[in-house]
Amino acid sequence: MALWEGGTVAWRDYVCAEWTGANPPVYFPQRSIRSERYKLIVNYLSDRPNPSAIGYSGPNQLWEPGATVEEILACDDRVRNAYARYLDPPPEELFDLEKDPWEYDNLIDDVTLNDVKTDLRSKLAEWQSETDDRIADPEILNRLTQEHDTISASQYGESAWGSRDFEWNYADYLFGHNEAGK
């Protein structure tokens, strides 16, 4: 209300975001944090292709708003490289939003930015702790990933829209809920 009433407001120094998935086939947990200038993205399943990238671009495109292979190939190297990174993201990505607002150049290996990386990693871990983000626990991440993989294989093999004939178990191990405690 202070801003509304003409007062001053203390603005945030960081903004955090999370993506886990909209449905089992696009499960791909990511967390990000940005400061005024830099953005860090953590890709928890960098050992596999990003299913959203598969669905929105490339030869197996499932959804219209994405880019076709021909459209991607017609782009310059920076755009093609961005699509390649979208499909096969590294464990972490770091962008200088002042110099590179479109996030083309991943600076994660730039040693001159070690202090920036340390700060963003620390603030992201703090936020994950404050919000009780269970994905930060490797055991929980593995269990949730196995559950998504099982459901995707059994219910979504022939269609991205799949079946709804399954039950999730994640509430039990993420939040300690069970049938009796609903």
Predicted segments — roles?
Residues 75-92, 97-99, 107-182:
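Long, internal low-complexity/basic segments
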